[in-house]
Amino acid sequence: MPFFDPSARFTRSICNRGGVMSFKIAIIGAGSVGFTKKLFTDLLCVPEFRDIEVALTDISQHNLDMIRAILDKIVEANGFPVKVTAHTDRRRALEGAKYIISCVRVGGLEAYADDIRIPLKYGIDQCVGDTICAGGILYGQRNIPVILDFCKDIREVAAPGAKFLNYANPMAMNTWAAIEYGKVDTVGLCHGVQHGAEQIAEILGAKSLADLDYICSGINHQTWFIDLRLNGRKIGKEELVAAFEAHPVFSQQEKLRIDVLKRFGVYSTESNGHLSEYLPWYRKRPEEIARWIDMSDWIHGETGGYLRHSTETRNWFETEFPQFLASAAKPIDPAKRSNEHASHILEALETGRVYRGHFNVKNNGVISNLPADAIIESPGFVDRFGINMVSGITLPEACAATCMASINVQRMSVHAAVTGDIDLLKLAVLHDPLVGAVATPEEVWQMVDEMVVAQAGWLPQYADAVPAAKERLATSTVKTRDWAGAARRNVRSIEELRAEKMALKKAV
């Protein structure tokens, strides 16, 4: 990682009364209301950050108005001098910003529905579809041109040396594009490691998460607990398998992850549903999908589960907004600060308090048996000198092989997104592990044509390729199917959601 001159940081962060700092943070895609609220309250848990400026930007004025109202309520309730602004003009929001956080979803739920729906016609059943597989690759094609626009704005109007914190999926592809082509100081952030650690602490009976020490390494959504210790005692494969299989809930919800643990010898940080679509073995036939997933919650493998969840969440928030707004008028409780990395990284960079986490960066030798150009997720420490990665890590061979399959897909996908090369895009999809386990080359070629045509409005780099794709689709002989997937659930109505929430309250 690059060495940062600490004096440059001090000149840009003005210290006011009592050590309180004044600098600007911009949040792109701030219309992701729940996540933006969490980031904001986390930031205000840092005592020195209560005089900062937070500039929100989104293409939706409606969403901006909602999140601005919520954040204003928080500021008012706590009496902090924080300044909150909202802009549909992104460059205005980024002007002078020292830190830029992105949580965008280009195309929204409309395009996301195509990421799930169209591959199902070719037998490809995804739970999430936001990392690789057919849906994740097309998601990256939509996001990367916009990410590069963000980077251009950062270079031109943000503070000199501004840092870009990317939360948006597909994490590795977006971060790869920002570093390689956007030429901006970028780190990718995800919470998968933290969630996996919480599970392990629970099954091992740890009194506190602090009793658990671990090293996770790999790539985003395919990171592995390669060293695990409880109160200094090393935890091996057999003990971990036995603990998971004895747990009444995780033994059912994480069947696939437990099977991978048995075979690979290490536990994956990612959820059962996520992991199932990065591997070629568990979602290739309907009966296999039913065998390995759990329907108690979308994240355990439901077909299109995250799309359903996201749709219900959006509808619920729109309907219940007055209640969300009223609940925002509460004092900040630092004890409830989340484990999302962003606020902890900024605190370490600005105050020098050291923070340890797992970050997505360009490899450059951090993991010895993965390519130097890949975006890896691995441990690092943050202080005033920047993000400093722990180097010299070697993954178990099976983990490295699985990561390599995804890295090759990611590299082709990024290059295709930047160049608008539809043939390279098709090759990227063809080499995806799950796609390759299910679909023939002819099916992949037609599926990509269909997805590019359906999403043409969000894919400007493929404008010249769309007419020919339409012509091929008009004369195609590849058969498709009308299939909802192996484990699909309908989107619940507001009334159904309200009834379920009431029932849960009564049951407590």
Segments the model singles out, each with a brief description of its role:
Residues 150-231:
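Internal, well-ordered domain-core segments that constitute the primary functional module
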Residues 110-181:
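Rossmann-fold NAD(P)-binding glycine/threonine-rich loop
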Residues 72-76, 156, 176-186, 202-206, ...:
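Short, surface-exposed basic-aromatic patches at helix termini and helix-loop junctions that form
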Residues 25-54:
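N-terminal Rossmann-like dinucleotide-binding module
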Residues 3-20:
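Short, Lys/Arg-enriched N-terminal segments with co-localized hydrophobic residues
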Residues 48-72:
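NAD(P)-binding Rossmann-fold cofactor-contacting core
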Residues 205-505:
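Long, compositionally biased stretches enriched for glycine and/or charged residues
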Residues 83-96:
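Short acidic low-complexity segments
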